[in-house]
Amino acid sequence: DRSRGLGDVYKRQVKELDSRQTLVKKVSIVPLEVIVRNISAGSFAKHYGVEEGIVFEHPTIEFSYKNDALGDPLLNTYHALALKLATPEEIKTIEDYSFRINEALKAFWLTCGVTLVDFKLEFGRLSDGTIVLADEISPDTSRLWDVKTHEKLDKDRFRRDLGGVEEAYAETVSYTHLRAHETDQYL
């Protein structure tokens, strides 16, 4: 059931110290980057030779091996298991959390007039082995498009030399500030 709350995903967070700092528990990082995709864009469109903007009937998950020396290659769950990057139970938990986070983020961004195209996640293990979200979720880790115009509101503006990076980020921040008081309903 992907509609459950996300409290179990955030067990790492102890408390917010201020608007820019959060006290968290130490984790050992699972060396998998998880990319959740709702719409074809970026490397997905390039790798599979499809147009950007195709809305998927079901979101997809891609894993890449967090290894700079190897260029963070894409891999599937069988590769992750063979390389002992995670156990079958951990992979299942990571996939479940990723889909649940996706549903919450899509709902939140839609209220802001923004489409969540895709985003990346990183997970870690607490000292007791519990899998938790271990990295930020932000416009820097997400691909966001204006619902009506499909204007890119994320770092693709920089990557593709579209200009207006600061303005797009400011617009995104204004969306989130307008809805910040409502975020509990998505968690």
Please provide the spans of the model-predicted regions:
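Residues forming anionic-ligand binding surfaces in small-molecule and nucleic-acid pockets
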Residues: 60-88
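Short, well-ordered strand-loop elements centered on a beta-strand within folded domains, enriched
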Residues: 46-48, 74, 129-137
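Phosphate-binding core of ATP-grasp and ATP-grasp-like enzymes
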Residues: 54-71, 102-115, 138-143
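Conserved metal-phosphate-binding beta-hairpin within the catalytic cores
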Residues: 36, 116-135
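A long amphipathic alpha-helix within ATP-dependent nucleotide-binding catalytic cores
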Residues: 85-117
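C-terminal helix-cap and adjacent tail motif
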Residues: 137-179
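Active-site loop/lid in soluble adenylation, ligation, and acyl-transfer enzymes
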Residues: 4, 8-65
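Single conserved hydrophobic/aromatic residue that forms the stacking wall/gate
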Residues: 1-10, 177-180, 184-187
